[in-house]
Amino acid sequence: MIRLLFSFLLVLSVLTAPQRAIASSEFIEILNKNAALIQKSSSKTVAPVLEEIQSYGTRLAADFLIGWKNKELFFIKESSRIIRVDSTGKNEDGKKIVNISDAVTDEKLGIRLSKDVKQIKPNSGVRAKIASALVPVLLASEDIQDRQEGLDTLSRDIKSSHLEPLKNAIAAERNEDLKTRMEQAYIYASITHGENEDEIENAIFSLR
């Protein structure tokens, strides 16, 4: 039985590995196309990039957005490749060095001089836009702080695309206080963006 299970898992890993590679390749193409705006953008220019990344819709995209928002991403100056810095130090000549890996695939890229890479530092306006794009992911997180952040972000700028993930979050929420806040946000979101007249009417009456 154990041997059979091992064989199944081995076959499954072989079948899914190419799919992951294809997914990474497709996502990297999106990032390469938008590299300049990712490296330096404003709240006025970042929207199209976020829409394209968000529409990709996988955990890969969500992890990238989280890293971008938290200023955890860097890029290699000569190639514009987006990376993460795993550790820092100094070489034998006393020069600052960084140990880096690819931001999407986690491929280890070795050691570079610190001056060869640059941190991506989105300003507060861009980070707010990224947070809004992350709302569905944050609301579905197992971490209550993530869910609170998702709700806070949503409450500042409720969009029609937030209705479905908010509804799902309400059904799954275990914290009563947070669930009440979600329900209140859903009522206002339904009034603002709802397309079903009965749901809008029920939302209005629930305020009385």
Language-model segments: which ranges?
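N-terminal secretory signal peptides that target proteins for export/translocation
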Residues: 1-2
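Bacterial N-terminal signal peptides
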Residues: 6-17
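Extended repeat-based scaffolds of very large eukaryotic assembly and lipid-transport proteins
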Residues: 23-208
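Sec/Tat signal peptide C-region and signal peptidase I cleavage site
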Residues: 17-23
